[in-house]
Regions:
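Short, acidic/polar
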Residues: 50-65, 138-146, 220-231, 257, ...
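Non-catalytic cap/lid and distal C-terminal segments of serine-dependent acyl enzymes
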Residues: 373, 380, 386, 392-420, ...
Length: 721
C-alpha cells in the first residue's frame, strides 16, 4: 500500500532559490515602486476612485508606486457638470487634494467626450437642439471652469476623447473617419479644434492631448494620425497623443505597438499611454460592452501570458522613452477595474496584493532590451532524429517552433527563473515561435508545452522522466561539457537493468547498474571485484535519471579512461520519492527506502555482481531529495556506507555524526545560485572537527543537472581511496 507523507517543502536545506520556488509566498510589491524603477524613462500613473484616496492601505500603494494620478470618472463632464449651473466638485476635489497633499501631479481626464458627457449642452430649456455657437459657449465655460480649478495640480489634459470611428464603422465606401457623435453631427470636426483652443486659453502651460483607443489597429491608427496632423497643420494646439492602451494578452504584438508609436511620433513630441490594462480574453478597446469573465481564479497559464504581454509592452515603451513620457494604469486593482475583477487586467489583484506581473514590469533588464542572440543556432542535442527544433546557441539561448494552428496560446515551461516560461507567438506563417528572454543555465533542463492550458510534450525532443512524468528535454552548451561528452576513442562500460522483487513495497522494483569496461574479465586468473556507489535521484525522477539526464555512465567512462579513478560500479535505483507530496510541514523519514536499499537491493547487487564487501566498499550519495535520503540513512546506518555525498541535498554537521572514524569521506556540493554559504560553512566545520570533507560550488548553475554532473565528477575522484 502506498504511504503518502507531506514533504518538508522539499528541503529547507536545499537552497534559498529552490525553497522559494516550492511554495514560500513571495511579496511582489517588495522593492522599489514603479515610479522609482522608471525614473529615467517616464512617469507611472494610475486612475483612482473615491475609495482609493480614502483607504489608508490603498493610499500607501499609490504613494509608493505612482507619481501621476488620473481621476477615473470624477472629472468627466457628465459627472462634474451634470446640469447647467450645477457643479459636483466634491469627489473631484478630494482626489485633487490627495494629490496636492502628497506632491503628486495629475493628468486631467477628460474635457470633451461623446460618452459621460454633459448632454444638456446640446439642447435649450425646451429640449430643442441649440446652434453650435451656443454649444461652444457652454463648452468653453465648462473647460475654463474645470481647468482653472485644478491647474495648480494638473500637468496634462485629455482634451478630446475618442472622436475617431472604429474599424467596424468603416465598412461603407466613403464612410467618415469620425465618430458620428452629437458633437460631430452638430459641429463637424471643428469641435475638436475649439476644445483645444479653449483648453489652451485656460492653461497655456498644460500639455494638451487627443486620447483614443484601438490605436494600434492600422486603420484606426491612421485615422488618428490623419486627424491630428490636419489639426496641427491648421494651428490647433495639440501637444500629444494619448494611446489608451486597453489591450489584451494577445494583442497588440510588439510590431503593431512599435509602429503606432513611431507613426504618432512623426507629428507629436509627446505620447502618453493613458489607460493601460490587459484583458485576459481577445477583446480590446474602449467599448463599454464587453465580457466580464467567469468568477474563478486566474489560471496560471493565463497569468503567464499576461505577464509576458506586460513585459513585451514595456520593452517597447522603454525603447521609445524619448517620446513616451507617461504610462498610466486604468485603475489601482482588479477590484476597481471598469473591466470587472474576473478579467484580471491589472498588476494588483482584487485584494490589492501585487501580482508577479508587477515584478515583471518593475524588474526589467536594461541589457536584455536590446540584446540580440548570436546567430549560431544548432538543433538541441536531445532532439528526435531528423528534428531541427528546438534549437540552442553558444550563448545559452533556446528557441522553439511549434505547429498548433488552432491554438490560442503556447507556452514553453523553460525560461528565466520565476517567469512561468517562454510565451510563444504566431509568426506570419501561423507557426508558434519564440526565444528565451536570456541565456539559460548550461546543462540539461526538463520542459513541456502548455497549449491553451493543456500540458503536452514537444514532439521535437526525446522524453525524460522528471516531475513525476515524462518531460521534454533540452541541453544548453556548457563551457566544460567535455567531461560528460561521449568519446569514441576510449573503451566504454555498459548499463544493465536489474529487476528485483521488493517485499517491503509488494512490487517489482528496478535499478540501473553501471559496469565499467573490463567488468567480468579475468585478471591473473581471477575476476576482479569492485566497490559500489549507490547514487540516488531527486523528487519526481526515477532510476533512469542519473544514467540519462545525469550522464553518469559517460562521466565514469571518461574518468576511468583518463586515469583519474579506479573502476567501480554505480547502482541507480528508484528511491520511492514520488509518493511524497509537496505542501505544509510534515514528516519524511526515508525509512521505506532505507528498508528497500539495505535489506533488499544491496543483497541483490552483491549476489548478482562482482562486488567487494563491507562498508568501506560502499558509498551512498544523492541529489536533492535523494540527498535528503542519503543523509537520513547514513546517520541512522553508518555501519553500511563508508563514503557519503550530498548533492544539493543539505549538509552534515559534526555533532550529527559524532565520530570521524565512522566515515572516510564526505562530499557536499551545490550550484552557486543555491546555498553556497551553507556548503562552505559545513565543509569547514567538518574539516575542523577532523572529518575528511570536500565541497564543490558549481559555477553559474542552480538546482539542476549540470550542478550534479560536476558534483559526481569531483566526488568520484575521492571515493574508495
Amino acid at each position: 500500500m502506498k504511504k503518502q507523507f507531506v514533504l518538508l517543502t522539499l528541503l529547507v536545506a536545499l537552497s534559498s532559490s529552490a525553497f522559494a520556488q516550492w511554495g514560500r509566498p513571495i511579496d511582489y510589491s517588495a522593492g522599489p515602486g514603479l515610479k522609482d524603477a522608471y525614473k529615467d524613462y517616464f512617469t507611472i500613473g494610475v486612475a483612482v476612485n473615491r475609495t482609493n484616496v480614502s483607504d489608508a492601505a490603498q493610499m500607501e500603494i499609490i504613494k509608493k508606486q505612482f507619481n501621476s494620478v488620473t481621476a477615473e470618472n470624477a472629472w468627466k463632464p457628465g459627472e462634474i457638470h451634470p446640469k447647467e449651473g450645477e457643479w459636483n466638485f466634491g469627489l473631484a476635489d478630494s482626489i485633487a487634494n490627495f494629490c496636492r497633499e502628497n506632491g503628486i501631479k495629475m493628468r486631467g481626464h477628460c474635457l470633451c467626450w461623446h460618452a459621460q458627457f454633459a448632454d444638456w449642452m446640446f439642447t435649450d430649456k425646451k429640449g430643442k437642439d441649440v446652434k453650435k455657437e451656443v454649444f461652444y459657449q457652454r463648452l468653453r465655460e465648462h473647460i475654463h471652469t474645470v481647468v482653472n480649478r485644478y491647474k495648480d495640480v494638473v500637468y496634462a489634459w485629455d482634451v478630446v476623447n475618442e472622436a475617431m470611428a472604429d474599424d467596424n464603422m468603416m465598412f461603407r465606401p466613403g464612410a467618415s473617419p469620425y465618430r458620428q457623435s452629437k458633437h460631430f453631427q452638430l459641429c463637424g470636426d471643428e469641435f475638436i479644434a475649439k476644445a483645444f483652443e479653449f483648453a489652451r486659453e485656460a492653461d497655456p502651460n498644460a500639455l494638451l492631448f487627443y486620447n483614443d483607443y484601438n490605436e494600434c489597429d492600422p486603420g484606426k491608427r491612421d485615422r488618428i494620425y490623419d486627424m491630428v496632423k490636419k489639426m496641427k497643420d491648421a494651428g490647433v494646439p495639440i501637444d500629444g497623443i494619448g494611446m489608451q492602451g486597453h489591450y489584451n494578452i494577445y494583442f497588440p504584438d510588439e510590431e503593431a505597438l512599435d509602429k503606432a508609436i513611431s507613426r504618432f511620433s512623426e507629428i507629436v513630441n509627446t505620447i502618453h499611454i493613458t489607460e493601460l490594462d490587459l484583458r485576459t480574453n481577445m477583446e480590446s478597446g474602449g467599448q463599454l460592452m464587453f465580457s466580464r469573465g467567469e468568477a474563478k481564479p486566474q489560471a496560471p497559464y493565463i497569468a503567464t501570458i499576461q505577464e509576458d504581454q506586460y513585459n513585451r509592452i514595456f520593452k517597447i515603451l522603454r525603447k521609445h522613452k524619448d517620446v513616451i513620457k507617461n504610462v498610466t494604469f486604468w485603475n489601482l486593482s482588479d477590484k476597481d477595474s471598469w473591466l470587472g475583477v474576473n478579467n484580471h487586467p491589472l498588476p494588483f489583484d482584487e485584494n490589492f496584493k501585487a501580482k508577479r506581473s508587477l515584478a515583471v514590469i518593475r524588474d526589467f533588464d536594461v541589457a536584455a532590451d536590446n540584446r540580440i542572440p548570436k546567430n549560431d543556432w544548432v538543433p538541441n542535442p536531445m532532439n528526435q532524429p531528423g528534428q531541427e527544433w528546438p534549437q540552442v546557441n553558444s550563448e545559452g539561448y533556446a528557441r522553439f517552433r511549434v505547429e498548433a494552428p488552432d491554438a490560442k496560446s503556447v507556452i514553453v515551461s523553460l525560461g528565466l527563473g520565476g517567469r512561468g516560461g517562454t510565451v510563444l507567438r504566431k509568426d506570419k506563417d501561423g507557426v508558434w515561435v519564440g526565444t528565451t528572454e536570456g541565456p539559460m543555465d548550461p546543462g540539461f533542463h526538463y520542459y513541456h508545452l502548455t497549449i491553451d492550458g493543456g500540458t503536452f510534450n514537444d514532439p521535437g525532443t526525446h522524453n525524460y522522466f522528471g516531475s513525476c512524468r515524462w518531460e521534454s528535454g533540452i541541453e544548453i552548451p556548457a563551457p566544460d561539457q567535455d567531461f560528460y561528452a561521449w568519446r569514441k576513442d576510449i573503451p566504454h562500460g555498459n548499463i544493465q537493468q536489474v529487476n528485483f522483487w521488493s517485499e517491503s513495497t509488494g512490487k517489482m522494483q528496478t535499478a540501473n547498474v553501471y559496469l565499467p569496461y573490463g567488468y567480468g574479465k579475468l585478471v591473473k586468473g581471477k575476476q576482479e571485484r569492485y566497490p559500489v556507489l549507490y547514487l540516488q535521484h531527486g523528487w519526481g525522477e526515477n532510476e533512469t535519471s542519473w544514467p540519462v539526464q545525469g550522464k553518469a555512465g559517460i562521466i565514469m567512462d571518461n574518468l576511468i579512461a583518463d586515469g583519474k579513478i579506479k573502476p567501480f560500479i554505480v547502482v541507480m535505483a528508484y528511491g520511492l520519492t514520488n509518493d511524497f507530496k509537496f505542501g505544509t510541514i510534515g514528516q519524511f523519514t526515508a525509512k521505506e527506502f532505507e528498508t528497500l536499499l539495505i535489506d533488499e537491493l544491496i543483497p541483490v547487487i552483491e549476489k548478482q555482481f562482482l562486488t567487494k564487501e563491507g562498508k568501506w566498499n560502499r558509498a551512498l550519495a544523492g541529489l536533492s531529495m535523494g540527498g535528503m535520503e542519503t543523509k537520513l540513512i547514513t546517520l541512522r546506518r553508518p555501519e553500511v556506507f563508508g563514503y557519503w555525498g550530498l548533492l544539493s541535498g543539505g549538509q552534515y554537521a559534526p555533532d550529527e555524526i559524532k565520530d570521524p572514524k565512522v566515515v572516510k569521506y564526505i562530499f557536499e556540493g551545490c550550484g552557486d545560485k543555491e546555498n553556497p554559504a551553507g556548503i562552505n560553512k559545513s565543509v569547514a566545520d567538518l574539516k575542523a572537527a577532523g572529518y575528511n570533507a570536500e565541497g564543490l560550488i558549481s559555477e553559474g548553475t542552480a538546482h539542476e543537472f549540470l550542478t550534479w554532473r560536476r558534483c559526481l565528477y569531483q566526488m568520484a575522484q575521492s571515493l574508495f581511496k
